[in-house]
Amino acid sequence: MQIIKTTIATFTAIAFTGAASFTSAEVVPLDRVVAVVDNRAITQTELDSRVQDVQVRSQAAGMRLPEADILNKQIIDQLISETLQLEMADRYGVQVSDQEVNASIGNIIQNAQMTEQQFVQQLASEGVSINEFRASIRRQLTMRSITEGLVSRRIRISEQEVDNFLKSADAQFWVSPDYHLGHILVALPSSPSSEAIVEAEEKANALYEKLKAGANFAEVAIAESNGPSALQGGDLGWRKSAELPTLFAELLPSLNNGDVTKPTRSQAGFHIIKLYESRGGQKQIVNQTRARHILVKTSEILNDAKAEAKLKDIRQQILDGADFAELAKTHSEDIGSRMSGGDLGWATPGTFVPAFEKTMAETKEGEISQPFKSRFGWHIMKVEERREEDMTQEALRQKARNMIMSRRFEDETQIWLQELRDEAFIDIKI
C-alpha cells in the first residue's frame, strides 16, 4: 500500500541521516522488503515467519526440506499469490466476520480434540499468540472466499455435461449410496454335496433366528462366520453400492437401518447381512424458503451505525404500509436481486452465508427481520413463504455439478492466478 511505501521511504531517510542527527543512538535495522506486488510490500519478517512455520510442520511430519534459497523462492512465490488474492478481496469488498473466524477455529479445536485452553497453550508453545492465529485464519478465509467466488464464475457447466457425467461409469460409482454393513458367511466347499448344502443352510437359519432374538451381530460373527471380516465382528465398514457384490446390492435398497437379511445363497455359501447405516440414495426432502432482502453496504462515508439506522428507517416505512419490493428497487445495493424487488427465489439450506441463513431460519413467514450484518453489508429480510420440496433428482444433478466443478476448479484457479500475475507489477528483490 502507499502507506507502506511512504513509511519505508521515511524510515530510509532517517536511517541515512541518523549518523549526523543521532550520533549516539543505536541504529535499528529496517524490515527488509523482499518483494513488491503492485503497491504492497512483502517483508523479510513475513518470509522468515512463513519459513519457520514450514520448518516446524515439516519436522513434525518427518519431511526433508530443500536448500534455503529454493525454499525461500517457493515461499515468496506463495506469498505473492496470496497477496494478489487479498488485493482482489479488497477490490471486491470481501469481509470475513468474527463469527466465521470463531466457527473455523472451533472446528480446528474440535478436530484436534482439545479444549480451548489447551489449544491456546499449544499455540503459545509454538510461539504463536491467539490473535496472530485469528489473523491467519481470517486471511485464509478471505482468500478462500474471493477465490471460490471468482473462479467458480469462470467455470461454465452445461446441462449436457451433467447428463453425460451421470451416464458415465465413474458417476454411477460416486453417486451410488453408501452402506455400513455387517456380514456373516456360512461357507460351502467348492463342490458341495446335497448334505453339505442342507447342513450349511440349517446353520445359517439358526444364526438368523438367534440374531432376530436379539443376539449381538458382532459376537455371532466372531464365533460363527467363515468370512474374511469375521474377526472384526463381520464389520465391512462403509462401502459404496457400486463396490458391493450384486447379491448384496440387490438386497440393500429394501432394508432399514438395523435390519438383518435372511440367509441368501451364493456359490461361496450362505450370507447374512446387517445394515448398520446408510447415506445417500434416499429421497431428499428439503425445506425451502423464499425471501426478499435489502442490502446496504458500508463505506468510509456510511459506517455500521449509519447503515443500520438507514435500514431501521426503511423497515419502519414497510411496517407503515410501504411496499418492500419497491423500496428494494430504490435502496438495495444487491445488483443481482434489486431489480426483482429483492426477491432471492426459492433457496435451500446452505445457499447463503451463515449470518443470512440464521436470520432467515429465525424469521417467520410474512415478518421483516431487524437489520443484521453479514460480510456483504447490512440487510433487512422479509420471509415470503416456506415449502417442502422433493429435491432427489435435483440433488443428484447438483452433486454431479459439484463433482465436475471440483475436477476443474484447481486448474482454473492456477490459470486465474497466472492471469493476476501477468497483470500485476511484481518485483522480487532477493
Curated annotation (Swiss-Prot):
Chaperone involved in the correct folding and assembly of outer membrane proteins. Recognizes specific patterns of aromatic residues and the orientation of their side chains, which are found more frequently in integral outer membrane proteins. May act in both early periplasmic and late outer membrane-associated steps of protein maturation. HAMAP family: Chaperone_SurA (MF_01183). InterPro entries: OMP_Chaperone_SurA, PPIase_dom_sf, PPIase_PpiC, PPIase_PpiC_CS, PPIase_SurA, SurA_N, Trigger_fact/SurA_dom_sf. One of its GO terms (cellular component) is outer membrane-bounded periplasmic space. One of its GO terms (biological process) is Gram-negative-bacterium-type cell outer membrane assembly. It catalyses: [protein]-peptidylproline (omega=180) = [protein]-peptidylproline (omega=0). It comes from the Bacteria. GO terms for molecular function: peptide binding; peptidyl-prolyl cis-trans isomerase activity; unfolded protein binding. Residues 176-277, 286-385 form the PpiC domain. Keywords: Chaperone, Isomerase, Periplasm, Repeat, Rotamase, Signal. It is found in: Periplasm. The keyword Nucleotide-binding does not apply. The PPIase activity resides only in the second parvulin domain. The N-terminal region and the C-terminal tail are necessary and sufficient for the chaperone activity of SurA. The PPIase activity is dispensable for SurA to function as a chaperone. The N-terminal region and the C-terminal tail are also required for porin recognition. This is Chaperone SurA. Disulfide bonds: none annotated. PROSITE patterns: PPIC_PPIASE_1 (PS01096), PPIC_PPIASE_2 (PS50198). Its EC number is 5.2.1.8. The keyword Isomerase applies. Its main location: periplasm. Residues 1-25 form the signal peptide. PANTHER family: CHAPERONE SURA (PTHR47637:SF1).
